[in-house]
Structure formats: C-alpha cells, structure tokens
UniProtKB/Swiss-Prot annotation:
It is found in: Secreted. It holds the Pfam family MIR. Residues 29-86, 94-149, 151-206 form the MIR domain. This is Stromal cell-derived factor 2-like protein. Coiled coil: none annotated. InterPro entries: MIR_dom_sf, MIR_motif. Keywords: Glycoprotein, Repeat, Secreted, Signal. The lineage of its organism: Eukaryota, Amoebozoa, Evosea, Eumycetozoa, Dictyostelia. It comes from the Eukaryota. The keyword Ribosomal protein does not apply. SUPFAM superfamilies: MIR domain. The keyword Signal applies. PANTHER family: GH21273P, STROMAL CELL-DERIVED FACTOR 2-LIKE PROTEIN. Residues 1-19 form the signal peptide.
C-alpha cells in the first residue's frame, strides 16, 4: 500500500516539475515577484547571501541572533530566501516587486527573517545583520526597502540594493572581512551607511513565480 501511495505521488509531482521547467523555457520570467524563493548574489564578489544555525556572540555588542554571511558557492540551500511583504502585511504571490517596496526576506531553511539593528557586527563593527523571528514572524527590523538601479520594477539579474527601513543602512558585503572558524571562507554581511559598490546585489538561482 505504501509503495502504491509513493508511485501515485511521483506520478503527480514529476509532471508538475517538468511542466514548470518547460513553461519557463517557453515563457521566461523576467520580473521578481512576491513568493519567489531566490538566491541573492553580491555583485562584486559573487558570494551568495546566506544564513545557518550558527549564532553571533553576545559579547562585544553582538546580539546572539542567527548569523548571516556571504557564502562562496552557489549550490547551498541555506542561501535561499523567500520574498514576502513587510512586517504585518501580506502580499499576493505573483505580485511584481517594485522600486521602493518594503519587503522581508525569509530564510527558507530556518524560517527566520533577514534583520538588522544597532548591534555591532563582529568584524567591521558596523550594524549587525542577522536572522530573527519565528516562522517568519518578527518585527519592523525585518523590513528592507528595494532600490533598483533603473526602472520601476525589480527585474531578474538587475542590480538592486536593500536599504534597512529602521536604521537606513544598506545591506553590504566586504570581501576582506573574512571569517575564520567555525565558518572559514565566508564573509561578513553588515549594514553600511554609504551606498557604494559593496551594496550591490542581483538575483540568481531560485524558484520564480510568474506575475499575476
């Protein structure tokens, strides 16, 4: 009976997977939409925005919250983020994200939100960027303003910046700020006051929903 159930599930899911792939080939999805699960690449380094069940220290101004890093490889599921509406608001899946929208980025594996605050980052001593909340529920420190370089809508592969709504700092990575043990080779993600090359990001791998 269990074998029959498994066969039925495979018969249902496999065609759906291939249907989605063929749909993308016939009708490329060019716009970034709410509900999509994406990887974000730091433009200067090509590192992916990443989180994991490793916490910052609480001494020296750290928060003790789940850490966020830049990861050098593109094949880790801990680099997947789901695009959601701002804290306290729901946005329909498939709605196009526009320049100036306030969004949350929910870490797919741990269900915590990309977050920032006035706690101090461990290496560069700028604003710490962490993951916070439970099952996608956090606070206004999870809100980020989308700033596209051109156009009114966030397009796949386009350079984009994320400005933290509460602190007005920009999500950034600095290649020289590299961690040692227990996460060697990964780089610090922090909130920087200046809009510069280190604050540029773009979408890469992921599951993208067509616009509605």
């Amino acid at each position: 009976m269990k074998s029959l159930f498994l066969i039925l599930i495979l018969c249902i899911t496999i065609p759906l997977i291939f249907a989605n792939e063929s749909q993308y080939e016939d009708h490329p999805i060019t716009k970034v939409t709410y509900g999509s699960m994406v990887k974000l690449a730091h433009v200067p380094t090509n590192f992916r925005l990443h989180s994991h069940k490793v916490s910052y220290g609480s001494s020296g101004g750290g928060s003790g919250q789940q850490s966020v890093t830049g990861f050098p490889e593109n094949d880790d599921t801990n680099s997947l983020w789901v695009i959601k509406g701002p804290h306290g608001n729901r946005v329909l899946q498939g709605t196009v994200v526009k320049n100036g929208d306030i969004i949350r980025l929910v870490h797919s594996n741990t269900k915590k939100n990309l977050h920032s605050h006035l706690a101090v980052s461990p290496l560069t001593k700028q604003n710490e960027v962490s993951c916070f909340g439970e099952n996608g529920e956090g606070d206004t420190g999870d809100n980020w303003i989308v700033e596209t370089e051109s156009g009114k809508e966030w397009m796949r592969g386009q350079v984009v910046r994320f400005k933290h709504a509460d602190t007005k700092t920009y999500l950034q990575a600095i290649e020289s700020a590299k961690y040692q043990n227990p996460i060697p080779g990964q780089i610090e993600i922090s909130g920087g006051k200046s809009k510069n090359e280190d604050t540029k990001w773009r979408t890469e791998e992921g599951i993208y929903f067509d616009e509605k």
